[in-house]
Every structure is written in structure tokens, then in C-alpha cells.
């Protein structure tokens, strides 16, 4: 595998006559995932009220959306080149349909435990279907458009923010305004599901370069090697420990079991690849994408947390729609940025990391709605190109891996969001908010502190707020704001004047905790910027960024070490 001797001109020419149809079929597939995820997030409160779930139970159901996706995309990516794209599409469509039947089964007459199982497994299967579709769509589009992967993968992934916008608007109108039953709302994701099923039906799917060359699974894994597998196995070990721990109740034993499973998987990859260390470049890309998952998927909830506390709930929804709409629009512009402005994919990533860092720092200083729109616009531009452009770089540089590398990369990003991004930011919020209130008003902190400390990886335990107590204060603020709005008072800060001194102290400390959390979070894209800058220097040193293509081994030069 060698770089092409001349940097090919960016071209939209596809390798198959039905390429555009397959592209838009993949678009609808990920759109279905976005619509379903947005609506599902909006009806969690409905499930809590109707079935009496605790916040912890709802959190576990939501977490099934991360775990299911990871299993779908990693397993799908490993077998994709061997069984073909078509069979995986059929499997994903069947899983989407099955998830709907399971999720719609609960009724108020059932026992809570029965309803919980239905919703958990319905969410899990929905996520497995989403992951399976990404295991198809990412390598399929990369194969169809080999000379402009960055552009077309960005178009493909524009469907995710589009789905979030559509799902959020539908949820706002049908739930908040019209009070429709949650089952009717959730059923709407079946519309784009039927759409991608129709568009994929009867289509011929091309084979990847690796599949065309007849590479074995072991050969496809060689660039991943022990280094790349180590990233995945460590994340899987942490994830499995977190899932099994509540069932067994023995943290040390569970942690040992999780890392044992991760170790077995790592050894299996070693045997398959004859213990090849893999590409250092791909290892670096995997680590960078771990950070992408943490900052892109893990951060949004905390930005919404700040906006939801500073402004009205409706204004918070508009800000979320604003950032998603920016992402959707800009993902159609990757070709212009690469072709007209002369940015390489790695150059795009460097710029985006800097913007994301600046945007998070601006978001931490939000004081008015106008400032919020500006700050979140900068952050949205920054995070727009991370995910699809990272997939494009991995696909450009490692065609021998077929669907494996980019599917593992997607799994790494999602696992990172679920076990590092969201939990890490939650820990930071607990730590900063608790420390702030304890310093400013120890008596109020003693009243509002959580019954047990928060833990995260190797960091010291931190005591935050009791979720129920601070939640009552936040709900009170939203109720007062709604009442004031009906009298013509639209200043969100006016509601804070009606809180008791103790409530105001706790509420303000929570806001300060949110702000400090976003500042701490900005170190992630700052680290990413340094990694991407090093990659930019590396590619400059070897003559510039170029895609590579599989060539016969006899024609390949023999480098001293594998780097990329």
C-alpha cells in the first residue's frame, strides 16, 4: 500500500452508476437514527411520569442507545466485507422494525419491571440497527467516491443533525404543544426507515478495495494491529465493567472480569494478525477520535443544561435547533473548503479543533440570548466536520482495512461519549458546583449536597448536588419564567429574584459549575488541535496529504517502519 505518486484532483466522479441513490439511501438511514434519537430524548419525561421510573432507570435506558450502537457498528464493520452490504441493510431494517414493536408494547397495566425491559431492549435494538447501518453507510460511501471522500462523507453525516432538528421540532410541537401520546411521536421514525428500505431495495452494492483484492480478515486487521485494538479493548473493558457492575454488585470482581474480556479480545486480534503492532498513524487517529466522541457527543447535553438554566425551555430548544441547523448546512460545504479554499482534510480538522475550543470558552461566558447564539454558532462550526472527516482520513490512508478501521473508529467515538465524555462532564459539574457552593455557603451546601460522592476513572471523589433537590429549584425557576412570560416579562433572570436566598445560592453555584465544566471541556479540542497539527506537519514532511491505494505487494517499496 503506497501513496499515489500524484495528488489526485478532488473529483465527484463515482465508481458506480447508482452511487447517488446509495448515498441518499444512507442519508435516510442515518436520518432515521437522528429523528428517533431526538424524539426518544424528548419523551423520557413521559416515561418517567407514566411508569414511575427513577432518573437512574431512565439513564440506563438512554445508555442502551450508546452500547447498542457500538455493538452494531463494530461487529457490522468486521463482517461487512465478508457478507456484503446488502445483508447488513436487511438486518438493520429488521432490527428497526423489531425495536418499534418492542418499544410500543408497554402499557400502564404492566408491571414496571416488564415495561422497563421492553423499553431497554427496544432502545438497545434500535441502537444496534443504527450502528449496523453506519457500518454499511460509511465504507459504502467511501468506496463509491474514492477521490472525494471528505465531501461525500460529510454529506452523508449531514443527515444526523437534520434528524435531530426534525425530531426536536416534532417533539416540541407534538409533545409540548399538542400533547400527543409518546407512541405516536416515536412511530414517526419509521417514515425515514421505510424511505431507506425502499431506496436500498434491489440495488447493486460495490465491493471495497480490500474486498476486491480478496484480503483475508487477518490482513485487513494488520494496519489496526495490537495498537489500534488496544484502544478498542480498553474502552470495551471499561464499558463492560460499568454494565455488569450493577448486576453483580462487586466492583473489583467486575473490573477484573471486564479487563479480562478486553485482554482476551486483544490476544485474539494479535493471533489473527500474527501480533502485528499496526500503524502508528491509525493508532493516533483512533486516540484522536476518542477525543472527538467525548467533545462532540458528550458536550451537547451540558450546553443545553446551561441554556436551560439561563433561559426559558423554549429558548433552549431554539438554540439546540440553531446549532444542529448550522451543522447540517455546513456539512454540504466540505467540497468547497477542500477544493476552493485549498484545505486538506487534516487542515480542516486543525481549524475545527481551534474553533471548538474557542466556542466552548465563549459558551462558558453566555450571559444573554444574543451572546448564546453567537457562542454556540462558533462551537457548532467547530464540531461540524470532526466525525465524517476523521472517517475520510482513515479510509483514504488505510484502504487495506476495508470497513474495519472506520467502523472501529465510529465505535470508539460512541464508546468514548458513553463512558468518558458524558460521565466525565457529569463528574466535572458535580465537582465544580459542589466546591463553589461549599466555599461560598457551607450551610446551603450541607443542605443540597448529594448523599454519595461522584467517581470518575482515577480522579478523586467529588460531592455534587442532590439531583432531586436541585431539580426542584430548576423546575421552580422554569415555572416562574412561564408565569412571568404570560404577563409580558421575558427576561429569564427576573425569575431568580423570586427564589429564596438558599435556592438562589444553590442555583447560582450550579450555573458556575456548568461554566467551569465547559472551560475544562475546552481542553479536549485544544489537545485535538495539537494532535492534528502534528499530523499536518507529518504529512507536510512526506510531501503532502494523499489518499493511498492497494497495489500488488511486489510493486510496493519496503519502508523501514510502518507509520501510515
What are these regions (language model features)?
Residues 40-44, 226-256, 270-321, 418-429:
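Extracytoplasmic gate region of multi-pass secondary transporters
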Residues 148-171, 407-429:
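Glycine-rich segments within core transmembrane alpha-helices of 12-TM secondary carriers
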Residues 248, 423-522, 554-564:
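Low-complexity, proline/glycine-enriched hydrophobic segments characteristic of transmembrane helices
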Residues 63-78, 321-334:
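Central cavity-lining transmembrane alpha-helices of secondary-active solute carriers
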Residues 94-112, 354-367:
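C-terminal ends and interior cores of transmembrane alpha-helices
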Residues 156-263:
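Helix-loop-helix hairpin linking two adjacent transmembrane segments in secondary transporters
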Residues 21-55, 138, 297-307, 421-422:
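Extracytoplasmic
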Amino acid at each position: 500500500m503506497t501513496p499515489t505518486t500524484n495528488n489526485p484532483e478532488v473529483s465527484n466522479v463515482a465508481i458506480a452508476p447508482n452511487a447517488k441513490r446509495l448515498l441518499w439511501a444512507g442519508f435516510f438511514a442515518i436520518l432515521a437514527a437522528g429523528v428517533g434519537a431526538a424524539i426518544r430524548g424528548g419523551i423520557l419525561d413521559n416515561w418517567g411520569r407514566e411508569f414511575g421510573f427513577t432518573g437512574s432507570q431512565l439513564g440506563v435506558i438512554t445508555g442502551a442507545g450508546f452500547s447498542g450502537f457500538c455493538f452494531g457498528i463494530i461487529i457490522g464493520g468486521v463482517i461487512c466485507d465478508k457478507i456484503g452490504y446488502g445483508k447488513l441493510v436487511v438486518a438493520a431494517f429488521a432490527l428497526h422494525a423489531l425495536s418499534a414493536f418492542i418499544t410500543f408494547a408497554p402499557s400502564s397495566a404492566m408491571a414496571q419491571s416488564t415495561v422497563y425491559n421492553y423499553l431497554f431492549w427496544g432502545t438497545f435494538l434500535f441502537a444496534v440497527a443504527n450502528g449496523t447501518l453506519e457500518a454499511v453507510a460509511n465504507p459504502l460511501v467511501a468506496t463509491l467516491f474514492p477521490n472525494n471522500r471528505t465531501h461525500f462523507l460529510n454529506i452523508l453525516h449531514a443527515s444526523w443533525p437534520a434528524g435531530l432538528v426534525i425530531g426536536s421540532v416534532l417533539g416540541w410541537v407534538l409533545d409540548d404543544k399538542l400533547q400527543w401520546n409518546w407512541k405516536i411521536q416515536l412511530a414517526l421514525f419509521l417514515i425515514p426507515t421505510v424511505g431507506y428500505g425502499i431506496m436500498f431495495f434491489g440495488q447493486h452494492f460495490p465491493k471495497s478495495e480490500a474486498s476486491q483484492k480478496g484480503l483475508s480478515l487477518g490482513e485487513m486487521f494488520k494496519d489496526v494491529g495490537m495498537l489500534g485494538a488496544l484502544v478498542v479493548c480498553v474502552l470495551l473493558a471499561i464499558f463492560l465493567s460499568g454494565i455488569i457492575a450493577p448486576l453483580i454488585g462487586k466492583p473489583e470482581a467486575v473490573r477484573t472480569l471486564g479487563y479480562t474480556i478486553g485482554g482476551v479480545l486483544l490476544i485474539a486480534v494479535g493471533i489473527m494478525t500474527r501480533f502485528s503492532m499496526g500503524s502508528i498513524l491509525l493508532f493516533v487517529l483512533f486516540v484522536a477520535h476518542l477525543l472527538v466522541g467525548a467533545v462532540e457527543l458528550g458536550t451537547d447535553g451540558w450546553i443545553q443544561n446551561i441554556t436551560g438554566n439561563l433561559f426559558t425551555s423554549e429558548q433552549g430548544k431554539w438554540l439546540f435547533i440553531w446549532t444542529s441547523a448550522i451543522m447540517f448546512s455546513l456539512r454540504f460545504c466540505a467540497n468547497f473548503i477542500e477544493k476552493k479554499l485549498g484545505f486538506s482534510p487534516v487542515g480542516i480538522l486543525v481549524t475545527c479543533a481551534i474553533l471548538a475550543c474557542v466556542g466552548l470558552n465563549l459558551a462558558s461566558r453566555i450571559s444573554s440570548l444574543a451572546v448564546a447564539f453567537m457562542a454556540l454558532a462558533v462551537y457548532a462550526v467547530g464540531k461540524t466536520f470532526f466525525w465524517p472527516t476523521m472517517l475520510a482520513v482513515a479510509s483514504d490512508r488505510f484502504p487495506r482495512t476495508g470497513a474495519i478501521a472506520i467502523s472501529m473508529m465510529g465505535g470508539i467515538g460512541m464508546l468514548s461519549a458513553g463512558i468518558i465524555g458524558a460521565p466525565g462532564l457529569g463528574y466535572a459539574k458535580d465537582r465544580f458546583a459542589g466546591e463553589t457552593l461549599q466555599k461560598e455557603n457551607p450551610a446551603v451546601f450541607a443542605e443540597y449536597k448529594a448523599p454519595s460522592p461522584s467517581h470518575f476513572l482515577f480522579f478523586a471523589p467529588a460531592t455534587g448536588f442532590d439531583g432531586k433537590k436541585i431539580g426542584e429549584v430548576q423546575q421552580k425557576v422554569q415555572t416562574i419564567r412561564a408565569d412571568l412570560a404570560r404577563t409580558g416579562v421575558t427576561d429569564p433572570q427576573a425569575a431568580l429574584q423570586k427564589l429564596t436566598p438558599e435556592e438562589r445560592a444553590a442555583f447560582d453555584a450550579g450555573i458556575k459549575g456548568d461554566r467551569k465544566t465547559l472551560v475544562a471541556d475546552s481542553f479536549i479540542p485544544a489537545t485535538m488541535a495539537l494532535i492534528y497539527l502534528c499530523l499536518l506537519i507529518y504529512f507536510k514532511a512526506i510531501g503532502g496529504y494523499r489518499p493511498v491505494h492497494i497495489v500488488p505487494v511486489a510493486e510496493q517499496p519496503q519502508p523501514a517502519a510502518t507509520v501510515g
